[in-house]
Amino acid sequence: VFTLGSYGYYPMGSGKLGGEAEPTEYPVMTVKTSQKTLLRAVTKDEYTGRSWRDTSSGRRYLYVNPRWRSLRQEVFLENMPAETVLKASNLLDQKAISIQMQNSAASTVFTPAYLRSLTTYGSMVPYFNEASELFITRDLISGDRYTVYAPVIEGGDASLGALVNAAPKNDPYYAQIAAKYTALPGHLEERVYQDMRSMIADAATPYEQACAILRHLQRYYRYTLSPVTPPENQDFVTYFLYVGKEGYCTYFASAMTVLCRMAGLPARYVEGFLAQPDSSGFAY
């Protein structure tokens, strides 16, 4: 299974957050895409204070098996949003994104968040799990290629807020989702909750609240590959917010997820890659 540790981002080992990152420089994949695309690898739902864990079922289901079609549609939100919402914006138009591996990697298949369909080539047999992660039955090797079809959405897009507002306000799955994806450990300090409330004070909708948290992190915290590592007895996100105030992707993603959950916004911690194409339409 994919881990950022294979690419130099878990120097503390065993998925423990923190430490000085040493990113690898070899190419992982080539991506043909018309715009900046976030490619998700793994999602995690439980925050311990020092790491993230995936507590979803370890069972995997054959992607093309009709028996699991309903589960696949639910996991990947294939039937969402409603047709009326789709017609309200072209933001959810499907794009073809072609990926070819340039080096060996774990069995995890990289895809955008809202996967609609997947075409694999050669001996790649895709499976999925209930965390909406995709895998094949072996490790990826150089030359493996596949095409995904999905809308390409970026948080903060001006038209995304309008799309969210057009969506139905009642979701039969919301209570179940919220219970799992707003859970936090009891040791988090009250001052973090107070500061979160200040961040979102002027935000009128859940989407605006998430954007307000994002802007706060972008404005007041610095990106670096050489941050100070929190002491063993301190919460990782709290230390980042109040002491270190600098870090790399795992720092910002952890803080964003925890703060969103504090605000009552269901959120998962996600790891993967950002594909940013050049003028030829390829990202490396």
Predicted regions and their residues:
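Helix-boundary/low-complexity linker signature
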Residues: 1-284
